[in-house]
Amino acid sequence: MMLGRVEKYLLEKIAAEKSIHITLVDPENITPAQASLVAKNSKNSGTAAIMIGGSTFVSQDHLDAVVKAIKSVVDIPTILFPNNVSGISPHSDAIWFMSLLNSVDPYFLIGAQILGAPLIKKYNIEPISMGYIIVGEGGTAGIIGKAIPIPYNKPE
């Protein structure tokens, strides 16, 4: 399988630097101007990319505005961290194509991916595979994703 531009960039940075930092911007409680400031400061501090997403719904227009604002101030990749099919913006460079591996709901294992794939292809967004496992309390992502979280203190 041929790697996309963003995935190749991330892997090359990891190989060269041994580890990288990726900043997560949750568009739910932030304005596009605030998001662009976070992205600019993060890039200046050495972050390799900006992830955009969260556990709850944000309007498509707001998500698009946040992605565009971030892209206007940084030249590092933007990677969507989608909460659902509604978390796809045509303005992003890439998207984590996630499967919530400890969900009891098939929708979060493969259903959302099936629904989102045509949009990702249409928008020409680079998909990057990710197996996602919720640990600890699980928080909002665990509740929405119907996950059985892996406890931090699970005995061997």
Regions found by a protein language model. Give the residues of each.
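Acidic (Asp/Glu)-rich catalytic clusters
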Residues: 13-15, 39-44, 73
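Active-site beta-loop-alpha junctions enriched in small/polar residues
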Residues: 25-30, 55, 83-85, 100, ...
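Hydrophobic faces of well-ordered beta-strands that scaffold small-molecule active sites
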Residues: 20-25, 50-52, 78-80, 95-97, ...
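N-terminal amphipathic alpha-helix/helix-capping segment at the start of soluble metabolic enzymes
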Residues: 1-25, 36, 116-129
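Alpha-helix-loop-beta-strand connector modules within alpha/beta enzyme cores
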Residues: 61-86, 115-128
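Glycine-rich, proline-tolerant flexible connector loops at the mouths of alpha/beta enzymes
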Residues: 51-65
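Short, acidic/polar
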Residues: 29-42, 83, 154-156
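Conserved anion-binding
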Residues: 87-156
